Amino acid sequence: MCIDIVGKKILLIGNGFDLAHGLPTSYKDFLDFCKMVRELYTYPIIDNEYNQKKLIDWNTDKTIKSKLLECYENRKNCFEDKITTQCKELDELYDCIKENVWINYFLEREKYIGENWIDFESEISNVVQAIETLKGYIERDEDVLKIKDTKQQTIIYFLKIAKKSLQDVFNLKRIDSFIEDISIELDKLIRSLEIYICEFVNEIDINKENDDIKTITPDYVLSFNYSNTYERIYGQSKKVTYDYIHGKADIKNNVDTCNLVLGIDEYLEDDKNDKLEFIAFKKFYQRIYKSTDSTYMKWVEQIKKYPEVNHNLFIFGHSLDKTDRDILKLLICNDNVTTKIYYYRKNKNDKKELGKLIKNLVRIMGQDELISRTMGEHKTIEFIPQTVFVAKNN
């Protein structure tokens, strides 16, 4: 029996997709939101005018500000022992962040860290690797003061933020307990991000769209985002198969059921199958443990099974960072896949973002393969400047 296999169009989107549509989804946006929420729940009643002005002057979307201002009014009129805003989702979010060691750490380190989620993940990785080094010294009964300066500084700084001393974690039982505690704190941070996406970001009215995206009409959308932005703007009336590879934000979840993936890349080589104390921080583990969608693997299987069938991959708003190397290579590095990578530019001569994408592709596939796929006789990769966003037609 002859089966007619038709090539597919796959759209791959990253956080740059949401940012390009004016949504406050950067790591800094989320951290600023957490700061504002903390102040909302902790300010003295006599300072209410000052805090209201801070909310009004805050440079963020008006939808978020109006929701927090409403919560502010409820908080101002609350005289119960337990502080609430009559918004149970925001109350839950505050419970997750109020004494969260990771939030505290990032607020303290804010001016030293970039604004992207990659910078956020890199900082977590630095802390994890430093604490893993500390545990190794404790296991071998070695002098922890001989740990390299950079890691030693990270350890001491993070312990200070966690209101701990070296003595508090200076045996195997204590440090294992500490590792478990900061893993739970990361879970709380992830849940607070889920609430932020569901209750605030997804409620923002998006008033612009992009012709590049509109004309693609994909069969599949592979989203590295937690939000439903593409579905809301472009996918309402189309038969599209979605794969939210890092999970899709759902307000019905809680800390235990939240399936969003936010972690670090594997940094070990020879010991990666033996040193498992920090496995819960790693993306591959979270994807398995949280049962995130892996429908994209079926697409890859079809691509490889029928090499004579040509497919089209469109990438928009993804940095092509090496942390997603395994997935990107499976899709891009196929002779029957034509890849179009859209990049942002401020003007016709601006190639800053293009340069970053090229560097990241070298890290993913190596120079030789990148050259053959962009300049060879049978090139499969093309870089395309994004068209200007226009007002959305309602």
What do these predicted regions represent?
Residues 288-299, 319-322:
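A general structural motif
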Residues 13, 29-32, 243, 247-248:
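Conserved beta-strand -> loop -> alpha-helix junction used to position metal-binding or nucleic-acid-contacting
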Residues 1-21, 27-30, 37, 48, ...:
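SIR2/sirtuin-family catalytic core signature
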Residues 39-42:
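Extreme N-terminus nucleophile/cap motif
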Residues 46-291:
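Extended, H/D-rich, highly charged conserved domains that either
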Residues 34, 110, 233-234, 331, ...:
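Generic structural signal for hydrophobic core residues of well-folded globular domains
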Residues 271-281, 299-303, 329-331:
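A glycine-rich, aromatic-flanked flexible loop/lid motif
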Residues 21-22, 231:
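Short N-terminal helix/helix-N-cap motif within the alpha/beta-hydrolase-1
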